[in-house]
Amino acid sequence: MTQQAAEVAKRRTFAIISHPDAGKTTITEKLLLMGKAISVAGTVKSRKSDRHATSDWMEMEKQRGISITTSVMQFPYRDHMINLLDTPGHEDFSEDTYRTLTAVDSALMVLDGGKGVEPRTIALMDVCRLRDTPIVSFINKLDRDIRDPIELLDEIEAVLKIKAAPITWPIGCYRDFKGVYHLADDYIIVYTAGHGHERTDTKIIQNLDSDEARAHLGDEYDRFVEQLELVQGACHEFNQQEFIDGQLTPVFFGTALGNFGVDHVLDAVVNWAPMPLARVANERTVEPEEEKFAGFVFKIQANMDPKHRDRIAFMRICSGRYEKGMKMRHVRLGKDVRIGDALTFFSSEREQLEEAYAGDIIGLHNHGTIQIGDTFTEGEALGFTGIPHFAPELFRRVRLKDPLKSKQLRQGLQQLAEEGATQVFFPQRSNDIILGAVGVLQFDVVASRLKEEYKVECAYEPITVWSARWIDCADKKKLEEFENKAVENLAVDGGGHLTYLAPTRVNLALMEERWPDVKFSATREHH
C-alpha cells in the first residue's frame, strides 16, 4: 500500500445535519473534544473571556448563537483523520448547506429525542438521498424527557424513508437515564454526566443477564428486558452494505450536553463510514488514490478574518496530494497558479498547510477569480458534476439608502452571490436589483454583511416573484422569440445566466406549456 493510499484510507469526511436546536453545535464541540481538539469544549477564550461556540464565528452568528456559515474542522481520532463539516442549522439557511453535502462521503443526523424528525431534517435528508449518502443517526437529549424510542425509530423510517437499525438502546431517560445497552455486543454503558471539557471514564457492565446489570437497572430490569425483546423482534439489524448504499441508518442514543454517546457515533463513522469515494467528473471518474491532484470548490466564504479583507475558497480534494507551493491548473480559466498558502481549518483557527490528501478540505485565498464549482488539477481538464444552484424561494427588491453607493452595492452583492450567501438578479427591463434566498434569515445576513464589510446600507421591498427558473433553449430562433415575448419577466443572474422570474405558479405553468422548446430549470450546475 502506497503512503498515499494509506493516507486516503485514514480519512473520514462527514457533515452534521439537524433541525435548529437539536443540539448540533454541542455535538460538534464534543466531537472535537474526542479528538482533543478543544481543551474546554465550547470555549475559545477571548480577552473578555466570553464563551462562544467554537464553530460559530461570524458576527451575526455570535449574536444569535446559531451556525449560519459552514465551518470545517479537522482533527485526529483513533489513527484516523476526521474532516467534520458543520452545516448551518438555523431555520433559515442557504443553499450553502446543500452544497456542503456535495463535499462529504457520509453524514451524521442529530435528532432531538423530545421532538423527533423535524422539517429541516427532512429537507437535508432529501439532499443526502440525491447522492445516496450513508447516514449515522444520533438521538440526542436523553438527559431530558424524550418520546418513546420505538416511536422515534418508526418515525425515522416512515418520514425519512430509510431503514433504522438501533445499535444502542436507552435505559430510561431524564432523571432516570442510566445509560445505554449495546444490542449486538450485550453490554451496558453506564451514564455519568460529563459536562464541558470533562471526558469521563466509561463504566461498562458486561452481560445483561449479570447480577451487576440487575442491580444497576433495579426495578426497571424486567420491563427493560421485555422492551428489548420487542425491539429485537421488530427492528432491522445493521447491515454494512445497506448503510453504504444509503438505505439503512445505524441509530445511537445519548446526550451531547452530558458528553455521553458521542464517542459511539464517532466510532461508527471510523468503523463503518466510507473512506473518500471516487468522484464523477464530466470526462471520467476520478479515483481518490490517483497520483495526480484534483479538487473542486464547493463554497466561498468572504471575510473569514475581519483583520484581513479576504475571501477563502473551500476545496474538497478528490485525488492526489496537495503539497505546499505546488502548481495547479485553474481549469475554468485555463491558467496555472502556484498555491503556497493553502489553509487547513480548525474552526476559526487557521493554519498553513504542508500537505493534504483526498477527502481533506483545504482553503485557498481568493482574490475574486475563484467561483463555486471551479476545478483545480495538475493540468487535466476536468469538471466535477453535481454542485448545483437551487432556485430561490423568497425574493426582495433592494433599495439603497445612499444612491451614490450603487457601485459598492453591486460589488458587494456580486461577491456575496459568488459565495452562495444569496442570489442576485438584474431584470432586463429596469434598473432594479432583486435578491433571491432559500430562507428569510439570508436577507438579514446580506444586509448586515453589506453594512459591516462594504459600508453600504440597504433596505428591502416586497416584489411579486413566485420563483425563478434558469432558461435554456437549443433553438436560437425560438429563444429569441421567447425573449421578445417574455422580456417583462426576464433577468440575468449574478453569473450572467438568463433567468425567468415567474410572478405566480400559474404563470410559470402557462409559460412552460406555451414554450415547449424552452427549458425552465429549477437548478443549475455551477460552470
Curated annotation (Swiss-Prot):
Gene3D superfamilies on file: P-loop containing nucleotide triphosphate hydrolases (3.40.50.300), Peptide chain release factor 3, domain III (3.30.70.3280)
Cited Pfam families: EF-G_D2 (PF22042), GTP_EFTU (PF00009), RF3_C (PF16658)
Single GO MF descriptor: GTPase activity
GO BP term, pick one: regulation of translational termination
Domain (tr-type G): residue spans on this chain: 9-277
Superkingdom of origin: Bacteria
Keywords, sorted A to Z: Cytoplasm, GTP-binding, Nucleotide-binding, Protein biosynthesis
Recorded GO CC terms: cytosol
Coiled-coil zones: none
Keyword hit for Cytoplasm: yes
Residues reported in the UniProt entry to bind GTP: 18-25, 86-90, 140-143
Name of the protein this chain belongs to: Peptide chain release factor 3
Organism this protein belongs to: Pseudomonas syringae pv. tomato (strain ATCC BAA-871 / DC3000)
Gene behind the chain: prfC
